[in-house]
């Protein structure tokens, strides 16, 4: 499997903090041909072991991703959210997102806010719902969205929102 295909498979996983199981599953499958065993501990850590008498090496990386947790659904069907991890209003505005159930949306800005004054509370998720009732058939308060941005190559470089460790 090519590196870009591996990154695309990992990007496709829904893995916000506390829900990294899908990511661990993909990593387990990817690692299986190269290791003797893969186990998951009580905290959800994936531990892959390659037997041998040579020097020991540890590769450590997080599997979770930044998330946006739905905190309120308004009468227009827009979703207010809180951060799961470090979020900046300036960085997340306009970002496509997806929920575990496949619902997709985008981070939008309410009204006219000066860039210097923009905060997370000025943002909302637009999932295309016409009203609150329709939105509630798509997502619930407490559901978490992650970035819905694919890995891709351009100019000999690889781009992905999950290149920090995952």
Where do the model's predicted regions map?
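N-terminal hydrophobic/helix-forming segments and targeting peptides
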Residues: 1-166
């Amino acid at each position: 499997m090519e590196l870009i295909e591996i990154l695309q498979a990992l990007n496709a996983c829904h893995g916000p903090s506390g829900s990294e199981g899908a990511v661990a599953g993909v990593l387990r499958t990817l690692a299986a041909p190269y290791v003797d065993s893969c186990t998951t501990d009580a905290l959800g850590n994936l531990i892959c072991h390659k037997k041998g008498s040579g020097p020991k090496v540890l590769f450590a990386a997080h599997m979770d991703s930044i998330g946006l947790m739905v905190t309120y659904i308004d009468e227009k069907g827009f979703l207010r959210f809180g951060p799961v991890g470090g979020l900046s209003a300036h960085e997340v505005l306009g970002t496509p997102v997806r929920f575990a159930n496949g619902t997709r949306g985008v981070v939008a800005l309410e009204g006219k806010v000066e860039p210097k004054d923009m905060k997370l509370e000025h943002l909302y998720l637009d999932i295309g719902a016409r009203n609150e009732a329709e939105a509630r058939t798509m997502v619930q308060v407490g559901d978490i969205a992650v970035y819905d941005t694919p890995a891709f190559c351009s100019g000999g470089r690889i781009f992905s929102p999950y290149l920090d460790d995952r």
